[in-house]
Amino acid sequence: MFLRALNVWIASFSKFRALRTPATQLITLSVHKYSTVQRAIKIVGGFDMPGQGKAQQHKGKGREPQRKKQKAKEKSKAEGGADEVVELDVKNLLENNRRKSEENGEKHTDAETSVSVVHEGKKDSPFPETEVTVSELSSTGEGLALSPNGDHVYVVPFALPGETARVRIYKTIKPKSYSLTDLVEVLKPSKQRDDSLIKCQYFGKCSGCQLQMIPYQDQLQHKKRIIEKAYANFSGLLPELIPAIGDTMGSPMQYGYRTKLTPHFTQPARNRRQEHGSDAPEIPPIGFMMKGRRKVMDIEDCPLGTDIVRSGLKNERKRVAENLHQYPYGGTLLVRESTKRVERNKENEALPSTDKVIRTTFPEYVEEKTYITDQNGISVEYVEDYQFHNIAGTFFQNNNSILPSFTGYVRDNALHPEPKPDATPAESAAAAKSNPKLKYLLDAYCGSGLFTIVLSGTFRSSLGIDVAASSIKCARENAKLSNVPNTGFAAADAAALFKDVPYPADQTLLVIDPPRKGCDTNFLNQLLAYGPTRVLYVSCNVHTQARDVGVLVEGKNGVRYDIESIRGFDFFPQTSHVESVAVLTKAIETKEE
């Protein structure tokens, strides 16, 4: 029986390899395998959108904000990964459709007994095709389409709400009531679609971008919706505790903005078996992952990269092809922009740009852009007039064009609420004086010191802390380079981050910018025990941010926070990724019941 089943699987896989039929319209994708979908966090019922009611300031003695009721097994820590996010979007779409059906008196089919998926498409194909109409765009940038009887969802990449499309089903997750598909053909395009906006020859196959066919203002609206859903799905808070999400701040550059690319490749087994000096080795694909497949696409150019990074990508591809023997199993490459500003003179003004140096003349200096490929090399970035040196392989924001607006927003919200657009001068002045006692800045997860340094002029004293000693070394050097006074950095123990902080909590602003996984329980407990007056939570994953903010709003031992504002920032145009800043203020302390 086992051998028979194995032979059937091999035959099916052979058909699977042959099913790469070109589409006749718009976008073509190939069939592929996909990774197992991870566990989803389960939220009872549908959701209401944040901002429908004004965020309440619960100041009554002993009164704690109410969270959504959840089953015991549903309290496990959400990870905010792509699979988890898609599953929640699918779950909510199905529940909303079920609710509408019941309101209209329609009979609903149980997803567990439905046969709507099994018999669709070509019966002799292991990967059936079907026609769907997309209902909405998921938080991961994929279209979600309901089955005819509304009990199942098809996840369709590169498709937009309202579009009718032919898709190929390659995996069905019956317990979660959805299927993963390839887009074969767009039969009826949405009015929102504008394929003339697409600037990449690999779009529709490469997994890097999802939204190139959407006008930029529509991308920003979609990213605002992503944040709204993140707080509805992951925070566990009632809608009235979540303020209206602010409009997403756009990037000045929608292409040519990425200062770092990390293409990768796998050495073919044939090359590893060859003896040194034998036949010419096979050049593997060097680039990024194909959408939905565990396979690298050969990417010759990426229009998201800056000019010097794109030049560096081409040079690195050529270098690797000529030196494959140095990579017995493949590798991940680094191409990172570095900037040097030199005083203008006749000599450097006359120097031309090359494929390794791009020179631009400004009134006061000549800017030289180069690229770094050494993970341990030092890259140089300028944010406003501040200079930052970083170890090239470590984290630093990859979109320099939006950084001045982003850091300006953080600075404007460090001490007081952002004034309303229609505020009178008196109201603006009152808002500016709302937190006169804040004197100190504490920057956790400080990295190379971005926020500590940029915000230093606003506070009497600033301190950046991080568990990575190498980051602290860079931060100290950066403070010296920018001649920033009253600023210090310290390597801290993760188990006692706030133990030796010299600042009184009631006079301190805490800025946190954790990695994608967000803050762990230990850190959040330490934060609540320290209890700073104001918290600015900067996040590259709005789902884990929403989860963590929910914990801070719920509070512990009489310390909790209210959400003042939430706003997204588009660091990665053309993708579904959005970053967010949540501003929290400490509520009046209450006694735990």
Predicted regions located by residue number:
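Extended interfacial segments that mediate partner engagement and assembly in macromolecular machines
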Residues: 187-198, 204-321
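SH3/SH3-like beta-barrel fold
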Residues: 143-147, 167-169, 181
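N-terminal mitochondrial targeting presequence
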Residues: 1-42
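Terminal, basic amphipathic appendages of nucleotide-handling enzymes
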Residues: 50, 62, 72, 76-126, ...
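Rossmann-like S-adenosyl-L-methionine
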Residues: 39-68, 74-110, 122-123, 139, ...
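Flexible glycine-rich surface loops and low-complexity tracts that mediate binding to linear polymers
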Residues: 130-136, 163-174, 331-337
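Beta-strand/loop nucleic-acid-binding surfaces
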Residues: 146-161
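Short, basic/aromatic beta-hairpin or loop at an interaction surface
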Residues: 134-148
